[in-house]
Structures are given as structure tokens and as C-alpha cells.
A protein has these predicted regions:
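ATP-dependent adenylate-handling active sites, centered on carboxylate activation for C-N bond formation
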Residues: 1-133, 170-216
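Structural motif
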Residues: 36, 142-155, 203, 264-280
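N-terminal glutamine amidotransferase
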Residues: 43-47, 224, 228-231, 283
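Generic recognition of short, well-ordered alpha-helical interface segments
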Residues: 151, 155, 159, 163, ...
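PAPS-dependent sulfotransferase catalytic core
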Residues: 217-270
């Protein structure tokens, strides 16, 4: 739709389902530290493809952070619903089935605790018999602003530079590509923060951007479901489950951890548990 309107050359890049392990390991090593976000793989692939034609590219990084586009922002600000109360009760009996956001489900009323819980997986640490450290203090929530703007600033100060921009910089520079994002322009940030947070209606995020886009595109396109920049990690992990299982159990680097619960991750197949297997795999590469 965008390509047709602006008469641009649109190309799609498909992440293969049969990723080679040597190829994946080479991408993991580019981070120089255990970085468990699997989106490094599509980030590397698309950077590699763009670099064949251009040396500078524009990205949308910072848009979700600036405009509250993440689900954790909505959930951190929301008041308890019947569904959330149900999840909280379920969490009491089956805590290991929940990943990030568990403190939200355990009914904490503190904004900082709610928000930081979406950036950690303490239940996974407990499965490994590791005592979780309190990470709430790592996130600085500005109490002088309203809750919505406080979360936006927290994302900009912590999540965006240390996670998203870091990843994009590593993956793009590995392909001799420079990536720039208009959403980190300080004038745009000041403009968005100058608006009253009441423009965020009925838990609808990105209203400023959506209203702007409605001038050129139809509502179905502007309000389409959010699409994350990820690949099907769950299918890939479970397709190669025996390899991961044998590899992790035989690793001498992980001997300090209690891997007896690895059987639980293997048996209880889920998106969250596939991510946990991936985290262990990445961690092993840097120990």
C-alpha cells in the first residue's frame, strides 16, 4: 500500500525456516555479549540485503518507545479487569508458565514494579535455582510526570538505547550499513511530550501518528494489528529440540546451573519455553 502510494520499489525478505546453526552462531557472536533477543536474526538478514543496494537506510526504531506502542505500556497503565484478575489467580498455581510480566500478574500496584517486570523472567531463574535479583531499581521512573510520559521516558532512557538501538547498530554495521531513525530526533520527542496524555484514549496507543497517517491512508491500514519484527523462533527451536537439549546438557560451561528443569522446558512446549531454551543457548556462547 505504501509502495503503491509513493511509487517506491518494495521488496520482501523472507527468513528461512531451516536456519543453519553455524550461520545463527555467527550472528550471535556479533553482539559480543549474551543478547537473547531473537530479532537479531531478521535484523541481520535484512541489513545484509539492504547493504547490497544502499549504504544508508531509515528505520522505525523508537516509534513504539515514543508513542507507547508496546503491550507492556498498556498493561502497566491499565486498571485490573476481570481477565487480568483471572490470570492473577492462575499465576498463583502455575507461575512457571508465565514469562516476563509476572509481577504484573501478581497484582503489584507500583508502576515501576509493573513496568520492570516485563523486562525480566524471574520464574525462569527460579527454574534454574538462581535467586532473582531485584531489577526494579535499574529502571528510573520519573514520578514528576504523569504515568504515561514516565513510561515513555523510561523506554527512551533504558530499553531503546541498551536494547533496540544497540541491536540495530551491531547488525547493520556488520554489513557496512548505516541505519538512521527519525523517531529519535529530539524535536519530535519534545513535540510528542508537549501533548497532554489525554490524547491516548480507550487504551489506544500511537494516536498522534495514526491521526497523521489517516490523512493519506485508510483506517483498515492504519489500525491494522501490530506486527513484531521477529521470526518463528518457537517452530525453529522445537524442530531442533533434540539438538538444543543435548547441547545444553553436555555443556561444561553451564555446570554451575541446575539444568534438571530442562526436561520441563522440553516437555511443556510453548512460546515462552522456547524463548527460555534460546536464552540458555545464547548464554552458553559467552560463558
Amino acid at each position: 500500500i505504501v509502495s503503491e502510494k509513493y511509487n517506491t520499489n518494495h521488496q520482501s525478505v523472507i527468513v528461512p525456516t531451516n536456519l543453519n546453526f553455524d550461520y545463527v552462531n555467527s550472528i550471535i557472536n556479533l553482539m559480543d555479549e549474551p543478547y537473547a533477543d531473537p530479532s537479531i536474526i531478521p535484523s541481520f538478514i535484512i541489513s545484509n540485503e539492504i547493504s547490497k543496494h544502499y549504504k544508508v537506510a531509515i528505520s522505525g526504531d523508537g516509534g513504539d518507545e515514543l508513542l507507547g506502542g508496546y503491550e507492556r505500556t498498556k498493561l502497566s497503565l491499565s486498571k485490573s479487569s476481570k481477565f487480568e484478575n483471572y490470570l492473577s489467580k492462575l499465576y498463583k498455581f502455575y507461575p512457571s508458565y508465565f514469562g516476563t510480566g509476572s509481577k504484573f500478574l501478581s497484582k503489584s500496584s507500583e508502576l515501576q514494579v509493573k513496568y520492570s517486570s516485563f523486562l525480566e523472567d524471574n520464574n525462569f531463574l527460579k527454574l534454574l535455582k538462581i535467586n532473582p535479583q531485584n531489577t526494579d531499581s535499574y529502571i528510573n521512573i520519573n514520578n514528576e510526570l504523569d504515568d504515561y510520559k514516565s513510561l515513555i521516558l523510561a523506554d527512551y532512557q533504558f530499553f531503546l538505547p541498551d536494547m533496540m538501538m544497540y541491536k540495530v547498530d551491531r547488525m547493520s554495521m556488520a554489513n557496512s550499513l548505516e541505519v538512521r531513525s527519525p523517531f529519535v530526533d529530539h524535536k519530535l520527542i519534545e513535540y510528542v511530550l508537549s501533548h497532554n496524555s489525554t490524547y491516548r484514549k480507550d487504551n489506544e496507543n500511537k494516536l498522534l501518528l495514526k491521526n497523521y497517517l489517516l490523512e493519506d491512508f485508510n483506517k483498515d491500514f492504519v489500525y491494522r494489528k501490530k506486527q513484531g519484527f521477529v521470526f518463528d523462533l518457537e517452530s525453529w527451536i522445537y524442530k531442533n529440540l533434540d539438538y538444543f537439549y543435548d547441547y545444553l546438557l553436555s555443556s561444561t560451561k553451564l555446570k554451575e546451573f541446575d539444568l534438571s528443569s530442562l526436561n520441563l522446558l522440553k516437555i511443556n512446549k510453548s512460546r515462552i519455553n522456547s524463548q527460555r531454551i534460546w536464552k540458555l543457548y545464547v548464554l552458553e556462547k559467552f560463558i
